[in-house]
Amino acid sequence: MSYSCGLPSLSCRTSCSSRPCVPPSCHGCTLPGACNIPANVSNCNWFCEGSFNGSEKETMQFLNDRLASYLEKVRQLERDNAELENLIRERSQQQEPLVCASYQSYFKTIEELQQKILCSKSENARLVVQIDNAKLASDDFRTKYETELSLRQLVESDINGLRRILDELTLCRSDLEAQVESLKEELLCLKQNHEQEVNTLRCQLGDRLNVEVDAAPTVDLNQVLNETRSQYEALVETNRREVEQWFATQTEELNKQVVSSSEQLQSYQAEIIELRRTVNALEIELQAQHNLRDSLENTLTESEARYSSQLSQVQRLITNVESQLAEIRSDLERQNQEYQVLLDVRARLECEINTYRSLLESEDCKLPSNPCATTNACDKSTGPCISNPCGLRARCGPCNTFGY
């Protein structure tokens, strides 16, 4: 791009007339891509004497091109920055309410699940306590059952012993009855023998009554026999009474023992029936407690499985949300880094613009206000000066580009 400058032609001094005013190296360059631009143009000490030489025109043209490209790049970067800011703003406006709403719902769901888990834990603890109480009650019932079973066995053994005693007493009673019968038969036999002997003696005495003997008074045999008979009868009666009394006493005692044994047997049978009923009721209750424990354990297992599945689902949701948050954070960090890079580029461009501006200002200040005072300053190789160098000079294109 060529600029038509209204400035008069300028030429360098004799010390720099044979070479362009460009430093041998770009050590003064501080901006990227500007190494071909002189960092300090004032080293050439150039002033207006007539017209620019070729190298100075090329340098100014190059500076104007670079400045225009940098300004265009700054505008493009500003547009890109504005687009990125709008995109970030739209993205944040689009995602912020959704994320907040989803987080609130997740927090509410998590709180509800935590409350349910706490309720389940308390219910589980209560069920465990009930199971422990049921186990203790079942152990107590088992102990009572074993105690009652041992008592039942003892009572049955006592009943068997009493039955054996009753059998022995029955045998003894039958023996005593047999003895009484035998004594009665013996008594009848004795009576019959006595009658036979009496009759025999009477017959013998009846045959001897005709004999008369003068002797001492004889003994009355009938009286003796009667006395003997009365004595035997009294003895037999006494023995019979004693035997009957002994038999009655033994029978009464045996009856009392049988009655007491039967009463005890009935009471024991009633106790056994009651114990059987109690044992059956305890067995039924124990079976019910076992069924209740099994049902509670199944319910607990199902609840744990259900809540574990719900908790895993919530964990997956939380993981997805955290991954989305991580992606959003990474996107924000990346955009922030890009924004910082753009800000750095903008700052460097502004610094470069300020540097070019200061260079141009310094070069404008170094231009002499009356170059005709030094008429011998022109070199022969650069051509003669303009006849009227002190005329008014207008700003060139690059100066207008900076806004002066």
UniProtKB/Swiss-Prot annotation:
InterPro entries: IF_conserved, IF_rod_dom, Keratin_I. Expressed in the hair follicles. The keyword Chloroplast does not apply. PROSITE patterns: IF_ROD_1, IF_ROD_2. Residues 1-56 are annotated as: Head. Gene3D superfamilies: 1.20.5.170, Single helix bin, Vasodilator-stimulated phosphoprotein. Residues 103-203 are annotated as: Coil 1B. The record marks 305 as: Stutter. It holds the Pfam family Filament. Residues 204-219 are annotated as: Linker 12. The keyword Transmembrane helix does not apply. Keywords: Coiled coil, Intermediate filament, Keratin. It comes from the Eukaryota. One of its GO terms (molecular function) is structural molecule activity. Residues 220-363 are annotated as: Coil 2. GO terms for cellular component: cytoskeleton; cytosol; extracellular space; intermediate filament. Residues 364-404 are annotated as: Tail. Residues 92-102 are annotated as: Linker 1. Residues 56-367 form the IF rod domain. Belongs to the intermediate filament family. There are two types of hair/microfibrillar keratin, I (acidic) and II (neutral to basic). This is Keratin, type I cuticular Ha3-I. It comes from Homo sapiens.
